[in-house]
Curated annotation (Swiss-Prot):
Its EC number is 6.3.4.20. Gene3D superfamilies: HUPs. GO terms for molecular function: ATP binding; ligase activity, forming carbon-nitrogen bonds; zinc ion binding. The keyword Ligase applies. Catalyzes the ATP-dependent conversion of 7-carboxy-7-deazaguanine (CDG) to 7-cyano-7-deazaguanine (preQ(0)). This is 7-cyano-7-deazaguanine synthase.
Amino acid sequence: MKRAVVVFSGGQDSTTCLAQALHQYDEVHCVTFDYGQRHRAEIDVARSLALKLGVRAHKMLDVTLLNELAVSSLTRDSIPVPDYEPNADGIPNTFVPGRNILFLTLAAIYAYQVKAEAVITGVCETDFSGYPDCRDEFVKALNRAVNLGMAKDIRFETPLMWLDKAETWALADYWGKLNLVREETLTCYNGIKGDGCGHCAACNLRANGLNHYLADKAAVVTAMKQKTGLQ
């Protein structure tokens, strides 16, 4: 039996990954992290979506210690979430230091316990957000370290790594979940479900990707299939 663990936040990317995993694996587990994030609605959205998609095993993990250590606009109400700036340099204040290091490591420990062969995460390098822990180089390096530390061969899969946002929308549509992703996921840095606030970087990236996909579906689907190997 093929088993996978999906790192699941209830956002666009992880929901798209979950939709695909449910078609490609016999048994899919989700793990969602409570790290004291600014918008607690994320956890409720993740729980609701997992139930709606038929996930039988959904693990909620308390990692609120991260909130004490990692200062970010996503962990502190006192730090404002910036509006989207197309040419902004440096790491944005929405970056939570160590988040993906911790999430992937804990997901791998969970995968070890449930005998899953893969940990799936929706990180992406193509539409680079400025987050160093979304890079392919980082994921592969951590994967090697975790496998050495547990004497296990667990794959870290990144289905969206080389897709842009338009292609990610195409992938959600391929699995019949475009409307679900558009209406019921929470990607917005200001905690607004669906199309979000329309001002933050996450909303801008999401909206531009959707507009591109809807305007040029055939070309975007072709590019998505070439990158993913789907037929």
